[in-house]
Amino acid sequence: IMLYVGSPGILGEYYIWEQTTKQARYIASVHEAVDQLELGSFKSVKYMASDGVKLQGWLLMPRSGKPKGLVNYIHGGPHGPTIPYDYNSRMQIMAEMGYAVFAPNFRGSGGMGSGSFGDNFTRAGFTKWGTRMLDDMREGAEFVQANYEVGERVYTMGGSYGGYSSAQNMVRHNDYYDCSVIIAGFFEFDQLKNKWDGRGRAGTSDYVNTVMGTDPIELTAQSPIHNLDKIKSPIMIIHGKVDLRTPFDGAKRFVAALKKTDVDFEYHWYNHEGHGLYFNKNSSDQFKKVNRFLNSCDSRPPLNPKVASR
């Protein structure tokens, strides 16, 4: 039997289970260089939403120095939680850049049985992708700011649904986030429903309508492309040109619409990349650009210096 073992500090290792000796024999590492690095460890943070719902997230602090700010890192799905039992390159890299990174398990997260993140908790996020779920994210970040030394500025970042929410956060919570990094996101519900690669499969239409909703007024209100006038802070858009899950065409349309506004934004397209960046050179380039972008945001006055004061 071959076993795969991973952790926040180990990218991945392969073992062979020897049935005769009842021992696991090491075979190889996914990336020996990463395994030699001293990486940060995650801390569980429990907080309560403004409506009394108990929530939880994971906080990763820089290994040295005072954090330059707090990155509210939003997981994809969205109906699956962030769990720190495997290596998360984005979160570790952001921490190495000097940022505190918080990954909230907001309403709608699921995938952990019938407990805190079970089916009921998952269903609590249905049709609220751009509303209550975003409020849970902000309230988690505010709790972290109030209880940990994480700096004055707060950024929102994520991929897939995390990309969408990082765009919609700039609409719904434009008084809070200092900038946003949007990776492989979508920007309009109708466009996503009609173009994503899962359309046409048995039961998919019913599922999508159940989790996203069908009210045209609500879907428009929760679509960033229809609310560009509310975006006040800088945003960065990153997308692969052959993304079929959150189609590239949606990102292009969003950028075209942004060009007609005064929003401070930049965008980066990657050839031969799909839903996320997987070629090493592109992934490396992505984080260099993100680092530069956040450094430029760091030079701006924070939106909420009083929120971060302790």
Where are the regions a protein language model picked out?
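Glycine/Thr-rich phosphate-binding loops of Rossmann-like dinucleotide-binding domains
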Residues: L11-G12, A24, P81-T82, M112, ...
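Exposed loop/turn and edge beta-strand positions of beta-sandwich/beta-sheet ligand-binding modules
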Residues: S41, V53, K68, V150-E152, ...
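Conserved hydrophobic/aromatic pocket- or pore-lining residues that grip, position, or stack substrates
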Residues: Y14, Y47, G57, N72, ...
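Active-site-proximal cap/loop segments of hydrolase catalytic domains
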Residues: P104-R310
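Extracellular/periplasmic ectodomains of large secreted or surface enzymes and adhesion receptors
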Residues: Q19, E32-D51, L55, L59, ...
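Non-catalytic accessory segments flanking enzyme active sites
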Residues: I1-R63, I83, S89-Q92, E96
